[in-house]
């Protein structure tokens, strides 16, 4: 019965003269997500994209609901532009949706095709009456109308060549299609926050690359595998993600040997930003992305962010800046990264944490604490980047 998947794309429709660029990027991403699922046809109209699968419609839905830029989608029945066909199709669709009686419903009609002889309220009224007559019996009114709080809403869209009828609306990520806003480098740890930041960046159209700082043997290869697993989950929402496994061991040793203990975290984060900027500029990334949330830990006070940010001239996006931990954890569960993030494998940010880290560093004091390291910085970074491993991560 359901032969079409109706796709809605929300804010893209509000774009101006470059709207077609966003729509074409979304269609490109849809086609990429459906590779290997099966044969299909695709059609676009104003405000809608239609996918016509040859088979396995549920498999298509599972892939499509992960594509940023898609606000929602509906498995949809199609009928010709005549009222009798619409009546017959409406009964089938509503009966299929209802799993328990008695039930309440309403009909909503959108008449994009103004040549259709009936106006939207007339269609809703006539189809609603037909549904009551077809499903109820003289002895049992198991279906009633409730226009304010119905259990089921039958939706009808009248287009140029066909009528589309559906009840279900399945949420997608929304936002903009990945790649429509350029490319960014995510500083990815094995924790809860940074994968969520990466997902939110993708929703704003940013194509992700990721940099993980690996401090073997202080961090295990299992910590590295954990980050690879997180990247695989994020890659469900895009084509693929290039993951840089940064060699960070010698940098951390140098910080330990040359800097005051309470400044370990601040100076380590400054080195991460320096390394990230060099990798980003080399590979055409336009922005750095982090999982920082204001006040959450010592390195995420405003003073710390200011001092750490001083080493880079690149824009730094912090999608989680104003979120609390509960909000971030809820999003991590929603996107499928939470259970991996809480696995007990330490990353480089946790193994050298001083007992009393400075929480409100001043730039002059930080530069003084970093003084003994200054002559080594360029050499350390060049060596670390040269030893960095590059992986291409795809889901499945």
Curated annotation (Swiss-Prot):
Coiled coil: none annotated. Keywords: ATP-binding, Cytoplasm, Nucleotide-binding, RNA-binding, Thiamine biosynthesis, Transferase, tRNA-binding. It is an enzyme of class 2 (transferase). GO terms for cellular component: cytosol. The keyword Transferase applies. NCBIfam families: tRNA uracil 4-sulfurtransferase ThiI. Catalyzes the ATP-dependent transfer of a sulfur to tRNA to produce 4-thiouridine in position 8 of tRNAs, which functions as a near-UV photosensor. Also catalyzes the transfer of sulfur to the sulfur carrier protein ThiS, forming ThiS-thiocarboxylate. This is a step in the synthesis of thiazole, in the thiamine biosynthesis pathway. The sulfur is donated as persulfide by IscS. Its EC number is 2.8.1.4. One of its GO terms (biological process) is thiazole biosynthetic process. Residues 58-169 form the THUMP domain. GO terms for molecular function: ATP binding; CCA tRNA nucleotidyltransferase activity; tRNA binding; tRNA-uracil-4 sulfurtransferase activity. This is Probable tRNA sulfurtransferase. It is found in: Cytoplasm. It comes from Halothermothrix orenii (strain H 168 / OCM 544 / DSM 9562). The gene is thiI.
């Amino acid at each position: 019965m359901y032969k079409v998947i109706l796709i809605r794309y929300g804010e893209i429709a509000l774009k101006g003269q470059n709207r077609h660029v966003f729509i074409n990027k979304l269609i490109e991403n849809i086609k990429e997500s459906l590779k290997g699922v099966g044969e299909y046809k695709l059609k676009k109209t104003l405000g809608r994209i239609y996918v016509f699968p040859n088979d396995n419609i549920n498999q298509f839905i599972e892939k499509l609901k992960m594509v940023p830029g898609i606000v929602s989608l509906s498995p949809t029945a199609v009928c010709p532009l005549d009222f009798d066909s619409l009546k017959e199709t409406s009964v089938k669709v509503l009966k299929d949706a209802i799993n328990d009686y008695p039930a309440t419903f309403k009909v909503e009609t959108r008449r994009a095709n103004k040549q259709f002889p009936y106006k939207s309220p007339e269609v809703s009224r006539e189809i609603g009456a037909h549904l009551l007559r077809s499903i109820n019996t003289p002895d049992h009114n198991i279906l009633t109308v409730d226009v304010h709080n119905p259990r089921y809403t039958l939706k009808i869209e009248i287009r140029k060549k066909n009528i589309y009828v559906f009840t279900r609306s399945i949420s997608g990520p929304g936002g903009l299609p990945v790649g429509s806003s350029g490319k960014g480098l995510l500083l990815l740890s094995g924790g809860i926050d940074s994968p969520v930041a990466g997902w939110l960046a993708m929703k704003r159209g940013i194509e992700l690359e990721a940099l993980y700082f690996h401090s073997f043997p202080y961090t295990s290869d299992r910590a590295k595998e954990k980050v690879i697993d997180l990247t695989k989950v994020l890659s469900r929402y895009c084509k693929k993600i290039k993951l840089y496994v940064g060699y960070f061991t010698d940098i951390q040793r140098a910080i330990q040997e040359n800097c005051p203990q309470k400044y370990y975290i601040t100076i380590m984060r400054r080195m991460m930003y320096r390394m990230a900027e060099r990798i980003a500029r080399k590979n055409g990334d336009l922005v750095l992305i982090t999982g920082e949330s204001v006040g959450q830990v010592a390195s995420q006070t405003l003073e710390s962010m200011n001092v750490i940010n001083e080493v880079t001239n690149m824009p730094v996006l912090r999608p989680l800046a104003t979120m609390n931990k509960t909000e971030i954890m809820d999003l991590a569960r929603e996107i499928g990264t939470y259970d991996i993030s809480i696995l007990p494998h330490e990353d480089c940010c946790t193994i050298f944490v001083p007992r009393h880290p400075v929480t409100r560093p001043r730039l002059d004091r930080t530069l003084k604490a970093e003084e003994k390291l200054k002559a080594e910085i360029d050499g350390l970074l060049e060596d670390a980047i040269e030893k960095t491993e590059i992986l291409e991560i795809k889901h499945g």
